[in-house]
Swiss-Prot record:
Protein name (Swiss-Prot/TrEMBL): Photosystem I P700 chlorophyll a apoprotein A2
Organism, as annotated: Nicotiana tabacum (Common tobacco)
PANTHER family found in the cross-reference section: OUTER MEMBRANE PROTEIN, OMPA-RELATED (PTHR30128), PHOTOSYSTEM I P700 CHLOROPHYLL A APOPROTEIN A1-RELATED (PTHR30128:SF19)
Main location group: plastid
UniProt keyword annotations, A-Z: 4Fe-4S, Chlorophyll, Chloroplast, Chromophore, Electron transport, Iron, Iron-sulfur, Magnesium, Membrane, Metal-binding, Oxidoreductase, Photosynthesis, Photosystem I, Plastid, Thylakoid, Transmembrane, Transmembrane helix, Transport
Organism lineage string: Eukaryota, Viridiplantae, Streptophyta, Embryophyta, Tracheophyta
Assembly information from the UniProt record: The PsaA/B heterodimer binds the P700 chlorophyll special pair and subsequent electron acceptors. PSI consists of a core antenna complex that captures photons, and an electron transfer chain that converts photonic excitation into a charge separation. The eukaryotic PSI reaction center is composed of at least 11 subunits.
Amino acid sequence: MALRFPRFSQGLAQDPTTRRIWFGIATAHDFESHDDITEERLYQNIFASHFGQLAIIFLWTSGNLFHVAWQGNFESWVQDPLHVRPIAHAIWDPHFGQPAVEAFTRGGALGPVNIAYSGVYQWWYTIGLRTNEDLYTGALFLLFLSAISLIAGWLHLQPKWKPSVSWFKNAESRLNHHLSGLFGVSSLAWTGHLVHVAIPASRGEYVRWNNFLDVLPHPQGLGPLFTGQWNLYAQNPDSSSHLFGTAQGAGTAILTLLGGFHPQTQSLWLTDIAHHHLAIAFIFLVAGHMYRTNFGIGHSMKDLLDAHIPPGGRLGRGHKGLYDTINNSLHFQLGLALASLGVITSLVAQHMYSLPAYAFIAQDFTTQAALYTHHQYIAGFIMTGAFAHGAIFFIRDYNPEQNEDNVLARMLEHKEAIISHLSWASLFLGFHTLGLYVHNDVMLAFGTPEKQILIEPIFAQWIQSAHGKTSYGFDVLLSSTSGPAFNAGRSIWLPGWLNAVNENSNSLFLTIGPGDFLVHHAIALGLHTTTLILVKGALDARGSKLMPDKKDFGYSFPCDGPGRGGTCDISAWDAFYLAVFWMLNTIGWVTFYWHWKHITLWQGNVSQFNESSTYLMGWLRDYLWLNSSQLINGYNPFGMNSLSVWAWMFLFGHLVWATGFMFLISWRGYWQELIETLAWAHERTPLANLIRWRDKPVALSIVQARLVGLAHFSVGYIFTYAAFLIASTSGKFG
């Protein structure tokens, strides 16, 4: 018999039903479960696939550069970043005739184009790119890296070049190389690029390979470095009247500590950014020399972890046994990596708008909104993934003997306390927050808005004040605002920081009030509930009081028959599945809050947010309905405009989202009956019955149908909000 898909599982390949195809796709990347897999092949396959991943990333970023160079308007955008709309790429075939062609021909283009809301124009401009030729060069370089990555991936699958398992498990060498090489050297290289290329470009100096060695980034060259007069590099920074990209008002400093924003670009000072990367490089280069490898000096990870035993003996054996547990479990390592990356991605969302690093991006409101929302959603998916792999670790890799009485074992032993406390926190937050919103809603509905319960977030305002924000008047607590102590306290802050934090036109430390207090607690409810579901899923993955032998059923079992009082919906996979809905829900609240607060800030009517955000009808009417007006006006006498495509996507997103429920709220019997009826009709229809198939059609399993439903729900939800966000923001601000 010819080899059938999937080749990695002979059992599945012989399945006579369509289950073969779906289960084959579902387990294609679960290398551990494949036939003939060994630990060595598992590590080697994953290692090689990383190079493939890198190749795809380099190809994709190369495509961004290439399409902007070919079809974009980068050179004209550089001349006037605030008024020219950046073009992402052309639209080959604008449907719906001449009106569509006219609607989508903008940004100075000759034909229909898409506008870029990704911030790449601002990024490339900030790092010193100025011409289409620069973009093409970058695209070619990334293509070259992509090819190198593919070759490396192929090479490391050849017998001679396959690394051994011991190489993969050499934690100290990997730490040293990743800390020094990945973070240290790359940060140092980036500092070099900023100092040698980007900062000169911001001062009107065009540095490329042909004059790279002739143009000194600083008038005194390396002199101050070798004579120890490093402060000279910070003297004479760009003035507040500096015009970015020109020599007008430019200084000579390359490494500064100014704080705050460049007045014209509203972004962080490039010289501050270079200084930051140099400091990061120094720290990581040192950190990458701390672990013991061939030279017998430095820390051993195993010794470090084994030494971490809490004194007094009341907290067990601390980190004993963790080294082997983590080093031998890919799921544990992936869980840690995803948890870290998820947090960092959310921090990127937060910092990209509050402390913008790229020139003029703060004035491109649609891009700001798109980037914030994008990074928060990505963070949500990555963080839920961390718990999924944590649960798989407990099922497949956790060894109770090896971890006796250490922190891992103790987490499992007192899991009831953890889960019940999280549950209590979620219930408290949910009922109190909803209670306040509903009370305020009713007061508005009955025409007595003065009876709302409005709570000032005094602790958050105090924290903002402690960081130099003066508008709340917390200095009323001081005996004197002109004393030496007060003045000395002001000098702690960088001068630019105090200006920025008290300037109401940026997004740094936004002024907050009762509406913020409420939505903050709604978001806290979402975060705690999502965490509750995820933590419970991982801690109960091995077993619970109801089902002590759960680990024997694997990660994603649907049910264990009719016994035990019902065991459906309690696999670790089910917890992940439920948590994703809560995650999406939470990020919905986060992005609604961010977007509405910023729309009112940018339009100069912050009182709309402040007054309407304290009750539910305000959110529904003054945020969602008011801002979706351009998307739901259907056919009108004015025909097509450039928002029409978003209106269509808004509708389509709702359709995809609603389709999710078809899979989520119906069970296998319905689908099996439907499929058999369709197959019966097919076999009796002339012409159609010439097409035959070998696999007997069967319905998706319960778990698969849930996955399909979840995928439609998630994709539809995000599509819908993306269309709403981009259309409502670009409709107002361009």
